Amino acid sequence: SDSTISYKAQNLLEQAKKIQQLSNSTNTMLIWIAGISLLVGGIGVMNIMLVSVTERTSEIGLKKAIGAKKKAILMQFLTEAVVLTSLGGLLGVISGILLAFVISSLNQIPVAISVEASIVAVVFSMVIGIVFGLLPSYKAANLDPIDALRRE
């Protein structure tokens, strides 16, 4: 029988470069997925808030008729949007941490939880609430009280 042994020389520097390229590609893909998810989530929040404004038109009209300022109504709806997205962000961080620990326990892979990243995630969700809550809040603040009360 022919028993030949073959050897393959590998340059560790080239392997490290390939691993770095793969890591960079993966990070880029994850950033795109996260960005698209945030955009879709933000649009969802905006739609929910627009529906809320529509359903509460008479309430807004009544508040304006008894003297509520535009700024107060704008801040009310903006606060609701920020609370909604903050709770979503907090729930997402908690779910992510729990999932990381479950996967870690199954694969015996250590988990490192970044408090800074968790805080950034919740703050970013608040920013999404502000950005995507502006249009519905502005719409609510600028409703004409007479038209709003007439719709009831």
Language model features: what each stretch is:
Residues 17, 46, 147:
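Glycine-centered loop/turn positions within well-structured domains
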Residues 28-104, 108, 112-132, 136:
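Transmembrane alpha-helical interface segments in multi-pass membrane proteins
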Residues 137-152:
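Short cytosolic juxtamembrane segments of multi-pass membrane proteins
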